[in-house]
Amino acid sequence: MGKGGNQGEGSTELQAPMPTFRWEEIQKHNLRTDRWLVIDRKVYNVTKWSQRHPGGHRVIGHYSGEDATDAFRAFHLDLDFVGKFLKPLLIGELAPEEPSLDRGKSSQITEDFRALKKTAEDMNLFKTNHLFFFLLLSHIIVMESIAWFILSYFGNGWIPTVITAFVLATSQAQAGWLQHDYGHLSVYKKSIWNHIVHKFVIGHLKGASANWWNHRHFQHHAKPNIFHKDPDIKSLHVFVLGEWQPLEYGKKKLKYLPYNHQHEYFFLIGPPLLIPMYFQYQIIMTMIRRRDWVDLAWAISYYARFFYTYIPFYGILGALVFLNFIRFLESHWFVWVTQMNHIVMEIDLDHYRDWFSSQLAATCNVEQSFFNDWFSGHLNFQIEHHLFPTMPRHNLHKIAPLVKSLCAKHGIEYQEKPLLRALLDIVSSLKKSGELWLDAYLHK
């Protein structure tokens, strides 16, 4: 009988071979209307599904045409569950002769990093100490209570008002670090519980939006300090950052502001205004524009609670001024802490590095101490946090020595500095970029 002789009733039909692709072809599919990415050598067409991605379409788009294996593993807790959403998107796999990684990604560094992550799992460093996070939440609520007590007992004079504002700004800053933990799914094993508590902390305790934060912050983690991909370095022409941007602006004779003085006007419009003006407006408009009624309801619950508590002391207008004074104080704290780890590092176009190398190029650490840990929400361990975003922050210091060893092995710089030095480097970095702009503006 011929080849079809054994294909009859009850026989198993041979499965068609999976299409194979070369990196040269995959890299062409990096447009908003045409997105492919690779995970564990499997090729997925995520063009349409990216619009339904819970983390937003942009974070997927940033990896279009690339291997996204380590980013995929870093951001998701239950890989088997999220893997179910990938199955319908599978269109093929890498050709056998193709390397698993594309472009400038190092296979040896990647292999060592994955071994390091396995070591961290074996050390139970992804296991949460729930008492730690309970105490963090408790001390935030205690500060809220102390603030009300001060005004109730001492009245609304200038001194009690200023003290209360500092207490509430501290509470807001700490709530900001805490929502960051839940937003990164680093507290509970189940994503759903992290999402629920995240909405409570960022919404009811801070008046912000969980979805706005997710869509923005995960882009930053996926492509830190990469122009056109990391929203945290989108400075709206107010600052020029790194080396590439000031040179581009200078050569094109772009002068929206006197950037050679940006290290001076930073003190006037950076720390004071980011939260009370830019973030507060952007968050509210984003929730309304996207019709995110759930997050809006959570935010309204914060404002309702705040004004219900403080209108009796200050009246409507006074309570509004009081709120923005608190935001003003918190904004200084937030800006200095978040910028000390990134703005001083490499800021450039995408070089398509492997996960480990890209995170080390864009992040640095601040020395550990009890105060530094508390003050920064453990973001003094920014390197480890960026490498392992779902690792509970109380374990970051435990993996740090192993990260240092891996850096030393591959000749990658591991930067760690004192807190004051880290803060001063922000200003010196802005000054350096401003000088680069001025030189290019005048002479190129």
Swiss-Prot record:
GO biological process: one example: unsaturated fatty acid biosynthetic process
Protein name per UniProt: Acyl-CoA 6-desaturase
Coarse class of the protein's main subcellular location: endoplasmic reticulum
Gene Ontology terms for molecular function: acyl-CoA 6-desaturase activity; omega-6 fatty acid desaturase activity; oxidoreductase activity, acting on paired donors, with oxidation of a pair of donors resulting in the reduction of molecular oxygen to two molecules of water; stearoyl-CoA 9-desaturase activity
Disulfide bonds: none
Entry's EC annotation: 1.14.19.3
Motif (Histidine box-3): 382-386
Transmembrane segments annotated in the record for this chain: 131-151, 158-178, 265-285, 306-326
Residue ranges of the motif Histidine box-2: 217-221
Organism: Rattus norvegicus
Topology Cytoplasmic: residue spans: 1-130, 179-264, 327-444
Gene Ontology cellular component list: endoplasmic reticulum membrane
Its biological purpose: Involved in the biosynthesis of highly unsaturated fatty acids (HUFA) from the essential polyunsaturated fatty acids (PUFA) linoleic acid (LA) (18:2n-6) and alpha-linolenic acid (ALA) (18:3n-3) precursors, acting as a fatty acyl-coenzyme A (CoA) desaturase that introduces a cis double bond at carbon 6 of the fatty acyl chain. Catalyzes the first and rate limiting step in this pathway which is the desaturation of LA (18:2n-6) and ALA (18:3n-3) into gamma-linoleate (GLA) (18:3n-6) and stearidonate (18:4n-3), respectively.
Membrane topology: Multi-pass membrane protein
Entry-linked CDD domains: Delta6-FADS-like
Span of domain Cytochrome b5 heme-binding: 18-95
Locus of motif Histidine box-1: 180-184
Signals that turn on the gene: Inhibited by a shortage of insulin and an increase of glucagon.
